[in-house]
């Protein structure tokens, strides 16, 4: 029979890690998760996340609308200059110039909400990772028979994996919002006479506001679902095959 030799000192360190992890996890379930559920539920009820009129989220776009007559004259002068221009480097530098407007700021209302949301995303992913590791360390040696508790562990682990995937997607979604908004602002600045690009910026802000509320809700629900399913199945998760004492029939 193949065996792996483990130094007692190394095994002792692993045992300390396991005990510390179990203690942290039980503390999370006993006090931290209920606390976060309550905090996030209160956050969802704040006026900042319950704006009935989404047009109030509109951020000013400091992009002046050009005068058609002046723009036409400017375009004609530019064409004439390009014909006369022979220095390719100078022409390239001219093409790289930004739009003729000042800096366009982010939507401060959205940014403030995201500054509160991002630490919550980081926190729930870390806590979920901790609880997932705890669950994996409870999985017993693979044997035939009496595997109902192990099946319960597998089902809960599947739920945790699904939650982790969803929560990680929140970080990507936030980055995507800024990327898309930046593109929309750039288009609005480059073609200020096109009202659709201006409106697109506001539409993206409104959509992100609704996404923020949904993300807070999903984080709260993640804590609640984890707390509920682990509490209901705690014995099966911690001792999937029950007590090790022999059973008499």
Swiss-Prot record:
Annotated Basic and acidic residues bias: 68-98
GO cellular component: cytoplasm; nucleoplasm; proteasome activator complex
InterPro entries (UniProt xref): PA28_C, PA28_C_sf, PA28_N_sf, Proteasome_activ_PA28, Proteasome_activ_PA28_N, Proteasome_activ_sf
Superkingdom in the source lineage: Eukaryota
Keyword DNA-binding: no
Entry keywords, A to Z: Proteasome
Induction field: By interferon gamma.
Gene Ontology molecular function: endopeptidase activator activity
SUPFAM superfamilies: Proteasome activator (SSF47216)
Pfam families in the cross-refs: PA28_C, PA28_N
One of the GO BP terms on file: regulation of G1/S transition of mitotic cell cycle
Segments for region (Disordered): 60-102
Oligomer and partners: Heterodimer of PSME1 and PSME2, which forms a hexameric ring. PSME1 can form homoheptamers.
Family: Belongs to the PA28 family.
Function: Implicated in immunoproteasome assembly and required for efficient antigen processing. The PA28 activator complex enhances the generation of class I binding peptides by altering the cleavage pattern of the proteasome.
Protein name (record): Proteasome activator complex subunit 1
Protein species of origin: Rattus norvegicus (Rat)
């Amino acid at each position: 029979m193949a065996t792996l030799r483990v130094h007692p000192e190394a095994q002792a360190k692993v045992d300390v890690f396991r005990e510390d992890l179990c203690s942290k996890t039980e503390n999370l379930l006993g006090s931290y998760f209920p606390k976060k559920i309550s905090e996030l539920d209160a956050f969802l009820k704040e006026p900042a996340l319950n704006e009935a009129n989404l047009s109030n989220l509109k951020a000013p776009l400091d992009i002046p609308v050009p005068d058609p007559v002046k723009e036409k004259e400017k375009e004609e002068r530019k064409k004439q200059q390009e014909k006369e221009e022979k220095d390719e480097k100078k022409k390239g530098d001219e093409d790289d110039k930004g739009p003729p407007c000042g800096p366009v700021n982010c939507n401060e209302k959205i940014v403030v909400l995201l500054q509160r949301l991002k630490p919550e995303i980081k926190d729930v992913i870390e806590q979920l990772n901790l609880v997932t590791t705890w669950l994996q360390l409870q999985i017993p040696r693979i044997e035939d028979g009496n595997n109902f508790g192990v099946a319960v562990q597998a089902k809960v682990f599947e739920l945790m994996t699904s939650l982790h995937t969803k929560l990680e997607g929140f970080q990507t979604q936030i980055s995507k919002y800024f990327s898309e908004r930046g593109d929309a602002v750039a288009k609005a600045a480059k073609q200020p006479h096109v009202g659709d690009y201006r409106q697109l910026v506001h539409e993206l802000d409104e959509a992100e506001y609704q996404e923020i509320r949904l993300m807070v809700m999903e984080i709260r629900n993640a804590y609640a679902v984890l707390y509920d399913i682990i509490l209901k199945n705690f014995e099966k998760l911690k001792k999937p095959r029950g007590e090790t004492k022999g059973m008499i029939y």
